């Protein structure tokens, strides 16, 4: 695929050159074809956001995640999405952000505490053993879209890229996920797992799709409604009600 080849070239380039190339790339080289079509209406906003991160990176700011992973969530075909898990912005710790909400590289140790809490709740909910790694890509292969509301961050500065244009792109993305219809005109199967107030704020964009809402898994809030919320079994029950296959949430022992 041309897009995969183009993104591979970004991975091979030096840090700033990778970011510098992003604003001029065709949408089809940055994401799956159906995402390119769905986000064409916010292409100008997307290129503006990419130009912002390119300027930051070439100006010496350590931007996370890597250029090749900024739009990683959109490499997964839109047509395959059946669960949306919405995060806030990427982890600001260098080496953590990989372009998928809540996930880290399979080699990252220790894993972030929010992800540890997600594993703890998964064990309580489904009886699945926690993993020592934070690679969640096995979920994306089953139609779980791990999308952050904001797609970049400056290292060490959580929330630093809020209000820089990403929100328009992710608003369009959530709207596109919720707006899919089958041949009978019915909404395609979808469950949104919304952790925390920021995620919950997108609920009006979901077109009535079922949601699982709770506190955020952050150590600051997990004990105030995340633990015991059983998001994984509830999401699977809602998928079955829509005639969709449940997600196999168990992750490989090693990535």
Protein language model annotation of sequence segments:
Residues 1-13:
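A charge-rich, low-complexity, intrinsically flexible signal that marks solvent-exposed coils, linkers
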Residues 21-22, 88:
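Short, charged low-complexity linear motifs
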Residues 24-28:
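Intrinsic low-complexity, intrinsically disordered segments
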């Amino acid at each position: 695929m041309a897009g995969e080849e183009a993104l591979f070239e970004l991975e091979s380039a030096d840090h700033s050159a990778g970011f510098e190339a992003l604003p001029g790339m065709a949408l089809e080289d940055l994401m799956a074809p159906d995402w390119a079509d769905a986000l064409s209406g916010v292409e100008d906003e997307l290129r503006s956001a990419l130009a912002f991160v390119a300027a930051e990176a070439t100006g010496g700011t350590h931007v996370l995640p890597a250029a090749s992973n900024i739009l990683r969530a959109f490499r997964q075909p839109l047509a395959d999405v059946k669960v949306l898990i919405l995060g806030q912005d990427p982890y600001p710790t260098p080496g953590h952000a990989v372009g998928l909400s809540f996930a880290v590289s399979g080699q990252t140790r220790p894993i972030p505490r929010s992800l540890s809490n997600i594993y703890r709740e998964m064990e309580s909910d489904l009886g699945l053993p926690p993993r020592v790694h934070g690679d969640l890509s096995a979920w994306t292969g089953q139609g779980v879209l791990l999308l952050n509301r904001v797609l970049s961050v400056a290292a060490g500065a959580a929330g630093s890229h809020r209000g820089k244009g990403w929100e328009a792109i992710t608003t369009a993305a959530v709207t596109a996920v919720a707006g899919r219809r089958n041949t009978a005109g019915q909404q395609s199967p979808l469950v949104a797992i919304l952790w925390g107030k920021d995620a919950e704020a997108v609920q009006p964009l979901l077109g009535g799709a079922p949601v699982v809402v709770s506190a955020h898994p952050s150590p600051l809030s997990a004990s105030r409604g995340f633990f015991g919320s059983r998001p994984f079994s509830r999401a699977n029950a809602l998928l079955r009600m829509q005639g969709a296959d449940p997600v196999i949430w168990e992750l490989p022992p090693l990535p």
